Design a protein with these regions (language model features):
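Conserved beta-strand positions in the Rossmann-like core of class I SAM-dependent methyltransferases
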Residues: 28
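Secondary-structure boundary/capping motif
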Residues: 1-2, 31, 91
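Cofactor-binding loop segments of dinucleotide-utilizing enzymes, especially the Rossmann-like FAD-
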Residues: 8, 32, 98
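N-terminal Rossmann NAD(P)H-binding glycine-rich loop of SDR-like oxidoreductase domains
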Residues: 3-25
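Conserved Rossmann-fold NAD(P)-dependent oxidoreductase catalytic core, especially the SDR/UDP-sugar
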Residues: 80-140
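Short, charged N-terminal helix-start/capping segments
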Residues: 1-10, 79, 129-133
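NAD(P)H-binding glycine-rich loop region in Rossmannoid oxidoreductase-like domains
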Residues: 35-95, 101-108
């Protein structure tokens, strides 16, 4: 399969990219080109900014991924831009989320009110107010 990984140069990305390649997939990574991440030498690179993802649409079409794995999706507007950028390009998008969807992240960073959440966080933990109000969670 041809798999495009968005944000594959961070903490989790390189092991994911390496494992996908080890399993025999052709992998491309969409990133800003600013990371010194250790990626396998024959990985394809599509350089661009996540905030202007539509600008790379021709490159996405040229790679023609069977699956897109988004490692850095963090908001409703980003999800909408992702869906538009890949409409007609791929039939499958996998969104990898993070602790940012939970209220605990906002409380810890001082941007959401409330007490600290008990650990460990689970899928039953309270969601961030932004993600609840934007319809991002459960709406994509």
């Amino acid at each position: 399969m041809k798999i495009l990984v968005i944000g594959g140069t961070g903490f989790i990305g390189p092991p994911v990219v390496g494992e996908l390649q080890r399993l025999g997939h052709r992998v491309a990574v969409f990133h800003r080109g600013k990371s010194t991440a250790s990626l396998p030498p024959d990985i394809e690179h599509i350089i661009g900014d996540r905030q202007q993802i539509a600008e790379a649409q021709q490159n996405f079409e040229a790679f023609a991924p069977d699956v897109v794995v988004d490692m850095i999706l963090s908001s409703g507007p980003q999800a909408e831009a992702l869906m538009h950028a890949f409409h007609g390009v791929t039939r499958r998008i996998v969104a990898i989320s993070s602790i940012d969807v939970y209220r605990a992240c906002g409380v810890t960073h001082g941007i959401e009110p409330g007490p600290l959440e008990p650990l460990p966080l689970t899928e039953e933990s309270a969601l961030s107010n932004y993600n609840k109000s934007s319809g991002f969670i459960g709406g994509v």
